[in-house]
């Protein structure tokens, strides 16, 4: 606080001149809830990253699927818990009978720098901000650093387009050959896997009904989302 004005002026000058360099990382091992290694930075680096991110953060977060609340203001673990609870209580029991937790093993360590840079360039056009983010990304290898807000946001953005593609069944409806192949598989597999009264009722609606149902999945995503 004693040198606040001086530090702010120094940070602004470094940002404007594109001469800012991320400080050295201090690794820290975390054991709970899962074993991983995060990296600590001095306070000045966090202030710099938050300030640089501020003008574009809302726009980037609006790109990310809303079921990814980590690091978002007003969201977090309880927000995600309430989303899951809502789905369970508002959906038929047979539709929520199973829960499959999926995790990308060592996700942050596997992110390719060039692919990540091309991804955030879809949303950010300011040259100085791009230079600042590029420097942060390249300051850690392999992958991107775990333990700073900006890196967490970039990690979510990196998967954003994949999330929406998954919800739309990977846009197979835009490829007639692929769409009709999987539509036929959907109907035929329903015949083989029929186990419940509800599935029997769906089959009794006929092939045309099942074809239309599959098309709705592809156009609008699964109804839970």
Regions found by a protein language model. Name each.
Residues 7-19, 200-216:
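Inter-domain linker/hinge segments that demarcate the starts of reverse transcriptase
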Residues 82, 87-210, 219-225:
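Conserved polymerase palm-domain catalytic core
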Residues 1-116, 138:
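Conserved two-metal-ion catalytic palm core of "right-hand" nucleic acid polymerases
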Residues 74-78, 176, 212:
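Charge-rich, low-complexity amphipathic helices
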Residues 20-27, 38, 183, 212, ...:
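Generic preference for hydrophobic/aromatic residues in regular secondary structure cores
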